[in-house]
Amino acid sequence: MPENVAPRSGATAGAAGGRGKGAYQDRDKPAQIRFSNISAAKAVADAIRTSLGPKGMDKMIQDGKGDVTITNDGATILKQMQVLHPAARMLVELSKAQDIEAGDGTTSVVIIAGSLLDSCTKLLQKGIHPTIISESFQKALEKGIEILTDMSRPVELSDRETLLNSATTSLNSKVVSQYSSLLSPMSVNAVMKVIDPATATSVDLRDIKIVKKLGGTIDDCELVEGLVLTQKVSNSGITRVEKAKIGLIQFCLSAPKTDMDNQIVVSDYAQMDRVLREERAYILNLVKQIKKTGCNVLLIQKSILRDALSDLALHFLNKMKIMVIKDIEREDIEFICKTIGTKPVAHIDQFTADMLGSAELAEEVNLNGSGKLLKITGCASPGKTVTIVVRGSNKLVIEEAERSIHDALCVIRCLVKKRALIAGGGAPEIELALRLTEYSRTLSGMESYCVRAFADAMEVIPSTLAENAGLNPISTVTELRNRHAQGEKTAGINVRKGGISNILEELVVQPLLVSVSALTLATETVRSILKIDDVVNTR
């Protein structure tokens, strides 16, 4: 027994000595991890800094398959970036969160987070504890939201001019900015058609379908009150149906097939003839039942098991003057039903007249040489939905136009959610910096120091805007500070004229929700990165 004890005590002593050394060595580790996380996250923020604002640059992104995307939308750039570091990935998630919450300001939110992290580095190097920094940042955030809310002015949804200005400001920083005079009214009209301005508190953007069609230019984009389908009409003879009765089926109009492991053996031609006769009678019966309900436009869901529509069925439908559109995607069905008031039918026995939707006109429109579209307009019981048709000379332009329209729609959605506007052009951030610096003087000790650092970090937005517009960032931000100190709350960077002016007179406005959401999400992310002191890899 005693001989067993001796080594144990030795081991304990060794372990204690080892632990002492380990504790000494590991004391630096949390700080190293923190700095590593901060520098990785800052690298992501620096990567998209140049794409902020109307004079920001675009990024060309090539994926593994060789597909190219050209965009300056922060969320899109970060989504497609290959980010390995877990802390850097948090900034990608941050941008996604801002995209979901507000839909705009996805670049700003990451830049603000990067700047706050930069301030954290300086504070940590001075030996301030991460928890103190984190709590001070939370205080600064609460005060910041108050300041932004004070700066904002209420807006009514009936004030169309203001809504247009907000949408135009959002579109001005995009590749398609020269078309903002067309796309802004289109976005405003689309949102206003799908909500009741008096009672709405949010907008479901799924009610606004964006259909992309190659060919033409962005000038050819249009807003359609009704349904637009890119699928071709299957029977060539019928391209226009007035007083349309529209049915939507989820079963196939073709001969039934046997199960996978069954076979039918046909031994002579008389039996073959009988099989064909049966098939003909079966399909004719299906088509007659469809015709009996008064249906004259038939939409057929895409089927992967067998032909959704056989040639024989198409022949009969053609004879009965029924327009047929096949290969309707499963995910479009809900939108189609809401738009034209039809109900999907899974079996022929349920195909009755009350399942049909009705519309004034279903017409296949020829797009002078670049394909065809099917438009169904004048729906009798329209749900509140609209379709935006986006045209463009190539895939890159169309996709960027779609993203830009989505951002403009999101800006108007923000105004529906929170009916307040704030100036753009870096004005709110400079005001924040100024007022938070004043606020920091009322605090004592380390808190005051940390809030001051938070305030200084806010200046990154006007500084980046000035830099991207080719102005001198230091002199521009200094002048802005002076103007705000003299009480000009709405002085901001006028990128078009290359100077500082009252940004509200230039109609550069953004929803309050975008700024508040960006500030809140950026601060939350920075606080979580600060609190991390170790990264553990698991198998």
Curated annotation (Swiss-Prot):
Mg(2+) binds at residue 104. The modification Omega-N-methylarginine is found at residue 19. The keyword Transmembrane helix does not apply. It is found in: Cytoplasm; Melanosome; Cytoplasm, Cytoskeleton, Microtubule organizing center, Centrosome; Cytoplasm, Cytoskeleton, Cilium basal body. GO terms for cellular component: cell body; cell projection; centrosome; chaperonin-containing T-complex; cytosol; extracellular exosome; melanosome; microtubule. Component of the chaperonin-containing T-complex (TRiC), a molecular chaperone complex that assists the folding of actin, tubulin and other proteins upon ATP hydrolysis. The TRiC complex mediates the folding of WRAP53/TCAB1, thereby regulating telomere maintenance. As part of the TRiC complex may play a role in the assembly of BBSome, a complex involved in ciliogenesis regulating transports vesicles to the cilia. Its main location: cytoplasm. ADP binds at residues 53, 105-108, 172-174, 425, 510. The modification Phosphoserine is found at residues 36, 184, 202, 444. CDD domains: TCP1_delta. Residues 1-29 are annotated as: Disordered. This is T-complex protein 1 subunit delta. It catalyses: ATP + H2O = ADP + phosphate + H(+). Keywords: Acetylation, ATP-binding, Cell projection, Chaperone, Cytoplasm, Cytoskeleton, Hydrolase, Methylation, Nucleotide-binding, Phosphoprotein. Belongs to the TCP-1 chaperonin family. It comes from the Eukaryota. Its EC number is 3.6.1.-. The gene is CCT4. ATP binds at residues 53, 105-106, 174. One of its GO terms (molecular function) is ATP binding. It is an enzyme of class 3 (hydrolase). InterPro entries: Chap_CCT_delta, Chaperone_TCP-1, Chaperonin_TCP-1_CS, Cpn60/GroEL/TCP-1, GroEL-like_apical_dom_sf, GROEL-like_equatorial_sf, TCP-1-like_intermed_sf, TCP-1_chaperonin. Component of the chaperonin-containing T-complex (TRiC), a hexadecamer composed of two identical back-to-back stacked rings enclosing a protein folding chamber. Each ring is made up of eight different subunits: TCP1/CCT1, CCT2, CCT3, CCT4, CCT5, CCT6A/CCT6, CCT7, CCT8. Interacts with PACRG. Interacts with DNAAF4. Interacts with DLEC1. The modification N6-acetyllysine is found at residues 21, 288, 302, 319, 326. GO terms for biological process: binding of sperm to zona pellucida; chaperone mediated protein folding independent of cofactor; chaperone-mediated protein folding; positive regulation of protein localization to Cajal body; positive regulation of telomerase RNA localization to Cajal body; positive regulation of telomere maintenance via telomerase; protein folding; protein stabilization. It is linked to De novo genetic variants in nearly every subunit of the TRiC complex, including CCT4, have been found in individuals with a broad spectrum of brain malformations, and clinical phenotypes ranging from mild to severe epilepsy, developmental delay, intellectual disability, ataxia, and other features of cerebral malfunction.
